[in-house]
Structure formats: structure tokens, C-alpha cells
């Protein structure tokens, strides 16, 4: 189960960009593997051939995906990487699925909310 989502602040744990803090731009699921594109991380130069009437040729910088295991959720209050957990909260007749900070126990955000059916 993926506990991170688009727009989350993350810190890079390994590689040439180790220690960089940024936000997730995209999550890619392919062949049972999960990769993420992080803003300003794993930037490479790509040489593009010109296509007449479509684009100019040249060198452009693009962000390549990195494995999700190489990033961790970054808690901006404590300025440290933390593990994210899932918890179900029952309030009256509502059930909410929330993401929590495993270290402090505080709620990061709600994933979904449903109303309990009466039997």
C-alpha cells in the first residue's frame, strides 16, 4: 500500500540528491513497482532532435523518477523524516480513514470519510 501521495513533502534518503526536501509531482505504478517524480530531484539533460513544425531541437533538463523506497515523508514541524501510518477513526456514525505521523501520532490528513449504515 502506498502511503505517500502527490503533493506530499518528502526527503530523499539515497543517491546524488540525498538530503534534498521537495514535493512529489507524480506517482508512477508499473509492473508491480512504484516510482515517484520529485521536484528538482534526479534532474538529467536530454538531447532532443528537432521535429519540423513541432519543436526545436536542443538540450532540455527533465526530472526522472526514483524508487519510492528512496524517499520518506518529511515532517515540516520536527524537520525530520517520519513514517506514515493509516488509522480508522470512528466519530458517531462516520468512519474516517486518516494518515498519521507514526512518531507523534498526529493526523496528517483524511483519505476518505463514510457514513455508517444502520442495521
UniProtKB/Swiss-Prot annotation:
Part of the 50S ribosomal subunit. One of two assembly initiator proteins, it binds directly to the 5'-end of the 23S rRNA, where it nucleates assembly of the 50S subunit. One of the proteins that surrounds the polypeptide exit tunnel on the outside of the subunit. Belongs to the universal ribosomal protein uL24 family. Pfam families: ribosomal_L24. The gene is rplX. InterPro entries: KOW (IPR005824), Rib_uL2_dom2 (IPR014722), Ribosomal_uL24 (IPR003256), Ribosomal_uL24_KOW (IPR041988), Translation_prot_SH3-like_sf (IPR008991). SMART domains: KOW (SM00739). HAMAP family: Ribosomal_uL24_B. GO terms for molecular function: rRNA binding; structural constituent of ribosome. GO terms for cellular component: ribonucleoprotein complex; ribosome. One of its GO terms (biological process) is translation. Keywords: Ribonucleoprotein, Ribosomal protein, RNA-binding, rRNA-binding. It comes from the Bacteria. This is Large ribosomal subunit protein uL24.
